Amino acid sequence: MKILVLGGSPKGEASITLRYTRFLGMRFPEHRFEEVYVAASVRSLEKNLGELIAKVREADLVVFAFPLYVCLVHAAYKRFFELVEERALSSAFAGKPALLLATSIHWHDHTALEYVRGMAEDWGMGVCGVYSAGMDDLVKASERNRLEAFGRLAFRRAASGELPRRETAPRPDWDYVYAPQAGPARVDPRGLRALIVTDGAPGSGIRAMAERFGELFGGDSELVDLNALPMKGGCQGCIQCGLDNRCTYGDSDGVQAVYREKLRRADIVVWAYGIRDRYWSARAKTFIDRRFLDTHQPNAVGKQVVYLVSGPLSAHANLRQIISTMEEFSGGNLAALVTDEPRDTAAIDRAIRGAAECAVECHQVGYQAPRTFAGVGGAKVFRDEIWGKLRFPFVADHRYYKAHHFYDFPQKEWGARLKTTLLRALVHIPAIRRAILVDMKRHMVRPLDRVLESIRTSPGTP
Ligand SMILES: Cc1cc2nc3c(=O)[nH]c(=O)nc-3n(C[C@H](O)[C@H](O)[C@H](O)COP(=O)(O)O)c2cc1C
């Protein structure tokens, strides 16, 4: 087969991910592999996409080979997906088999894979295999064996001529443009400051939603338009930020100032984005990737966060999951999420107003919602990586994690360890085993009942 590898790394040839597809090329010499550094050359693809599309047309199999970048693909790879659709060229991909191969540290790799699967299936491709490699897997013989087995199965499936059926739902069209009503009754901002960031161009529905929030909030609010914000380029994956959280772009454009000054000053942060394909725009993604100047540290601790979204978010469960992940990781509280899905100005206005009120109220009482699996699981992945292999070059993260007690490994819980060791020994004695098992449900609620009892007897107990 002629196999075309579409590389998603901004590092081009120096991509870790491409080492995995090259390994497959070595193990399966009967197939002809060709690489294109799509993300690294997206600026030239903006001018000339034709050559690449000709290669796609000739290919028997297309491999989307990409690194994870903030729950998704890199902004430049995202831009490539947009270009194909803007120029109505997706028919070149239709009817072809696709493989997805990602490398990462497995922090929300599933959302990136789901995004690329959705895009490939939207273009009429059949996804014959999905592989999520840890970035260092290739050095382990067991992982090489696994990848080789994947290749054998996936290439056979791709060559069979039978395309697997699609697993993602087609994305719904969206043509609604919100236009606000005049004269909003203001929310009392109680001295709080709001930062509103949008990728909505003037005249778009999402821009109008962002501006509406600003008007309602009154007081101290600032709107950052990502279309006007100077951005020299996307994250280059150079990891210089790992040492001291200084981005290689420095203050040569406007991104660092938004994260370092405007975001830090704000009490309420509003992200106002329009859905573009299955995510936000590549412009928004460029800004989001550059958030990595704070590497693996939360950058919105204690802030209230509001999302304003234009588009059918309820049909994009994957994107909804990314929103939760991002905010649970950022340390902020997702106070409200408003979309223009009601397609009704008055209802959307009410929802925006409700969001502003909710954010103020949550801030007043200092509410932070507990994290779900997205935040709890993700924090454990980072904790273990920064403690271990990634301590260098992520020196600044290690410092932060130590200072903020992020190294909460279970092996430090001596009391719990002693108790479970004792119980594990005692359970071998039949009489004790019977007694424990009979009363297991009671054992589990006993400590909670004790708390309730102390509150009942002294209601002042926190
Ligand atoms: C800015 C940035 C963002 C990243 N985001 C994620 C992420 O969300 N999840 C993850 O597991 N790994 C993430 N990574 C790790 C890379 O995906 C991983 O190192 C990958 O193997 C790099 O491959 P490449 O050399 O082909 O670019 C990120 C790395 C960088 C530099």
Predicted regions and their residues:
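A charged, well-structured terminal subsegment
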Residues: E121-E167, F329-Y367
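A short secondary-structure junction signal
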Residues: T111-A112, S142, R207-A208, A282, ...
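Surface-exposed acidic, glycine-flexible loop patches that form ligand/cofactor-binding
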Residues: L89-A92, H296-N299
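Ligand-binding pocket scaffold of soluble enzyme catalytic domains
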Residues: L4-G7, Y307, P342-D349
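Short, conserved, surface-exposed binding loops centered on an aromatic residue
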Residues: R260-L263, Q297-A300, M326
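N-terminal beta1-alpha1-beta2 submodule of the flavodoxin-like/Rossmannoid cofactor-binding fold
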Residues: M1-R87, G151-F155, R165-L293, R350-A356, ...
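Short, glycine-/small-residue-rich phosphate/pyrophosphate-handling segment
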Residues: A94-M135, V301-D340
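Short, catalytically relevant binding-site loops at active-site mouths
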Residues: L229, R276-R278, L313-S314, P342-D344
